Amino acid sequence: MIISMILGLFSGLFAVSMMLGLNDQRMNSAVNSYLSHIQIHHPSFSENFDIKHTIQNLDSLDFSLKNDQSIKAFSSRTIISGMASTAHGSEGIRLIGIDPTSESKVTNVHTSMVKGTYFNSIKSKPALIGKKLAEKLQLDINKKIYLTFVDENGDQQRIKLKVEGIFKTASTLFDRTNIYMKREDLQ
């Protein structure tokens, strides 16, 4: 009787410890992969990722962040909802325009590459895509992907990117819905 109580108690403690550890691991993975520690958005941006809702006076904010000694690193991003398509299908995606150097200081996507490189080899409009999206659209390195989205003027835009790298994070949803490209290529 006492042995079964002790075994039950240890089993319960083990289960709780395991759940807490998995929760911590999942949270750390999300923060390091794509959330980062803090995000600053226009108050209305999160409602539907509308590109019209951008931060005003971005240069002033950049200056403040660069000169704040308590901030280790930061990265500006342009985030747009859109559609990715290939000859093998299409998928709703979130397009993330980044500066590769500053982004590598706040996320670990550059270390999550399973194929290709992190903005090193393709000079004209490279893209990084998640492994799940690559599988769904049957994409590989150096293959073309077309992205369609609405710009800040309400006009539909279509751009062609070339897959430079394929990443895999702990989140298959993130890997299936996100594409990284250079911010300068969105201008």
Predicted segments — roles?
Residues 33-35, 88-93, 114, 124, ...:
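Extracytoplasmic
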Residues 51, 105-109, 158, 175:
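Short, charged, solvent-exposed linker or helix-capping segments at domain edges/interfaces
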Residues 96-137:
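Short beta-strand boundary microenvironments
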Residues 132, 139-187:
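Basic-flanked hydrophobic alpha-helices used for secretion and membrane insertion
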